[in-house]
Amino acid sequence: YRDAKITTIYEGTNEIQRVVIASHLIGRLGKSSGGESRSAAKKPAPITGIRKRTIFREGDAAQQVNDLVAALKKDGHDFSVGIPMDTPIPKAERVVSAGKGIGEKKNMKLVEGLAKATGAAIGSSRPVAETLKYLPLDRYVGMSGQKFTGNLYIACGISGATQHLKGIKDASTIVAINKNGNAPIFKNCDYGIVGDVMEILPLLTAALDSGEKQPAPP
């Protein structure tokens, strides 16, 4: 068989070889009636499921931020209430996360400011916690880290690696801010702004800052 896998097994010092042939059937779909493979006929769905994928492009950065805030409020997000930034990720209803696009550690203050204005807990991608060590390991979100299932996730400078997207696939609303318009996160978000986090985050923080937050209902 062309698709067979041949495994050589050595037994003891005599190196007696046995050939085991196993057909590779997983992932090999039959042909459709039209002659095209089913896998080619149907594109894979986004990792985070069906999303709005609304990217705000009109006007300058300030207008894009205002359009984003208006959309979030229209969806029912109330920014007069909030949770502590150190709330455990699995228990948080809102999370603002930093990716490597945040740059130097001093720029984490922008993420913290947005988390406070949003009334959200703070999180990160795996490299930010594990490699850069900007946050403790229990703050990174992903398949091998914390799972977020709350109502609002804001990804700041996160490109959208598969393992990260699988950690947020059950979020109600995903917002992406990244200067790379081709980043996978934009195919897996509800709302997005293609822009530099250094410019967008201060604008978004100012737009959402409604003063002291009331405790979010349990």
Go through the PLM ranges and name each one:
Residues 1-39:
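Glycine-rich phosphate/cofactor-binding loops in nucleotide/flavin-utilizing enzymes
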Residues 31-218:
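N-terminal glycine-rich FAD/FM-binding segment characteristic of electron-transfer flavoproteins
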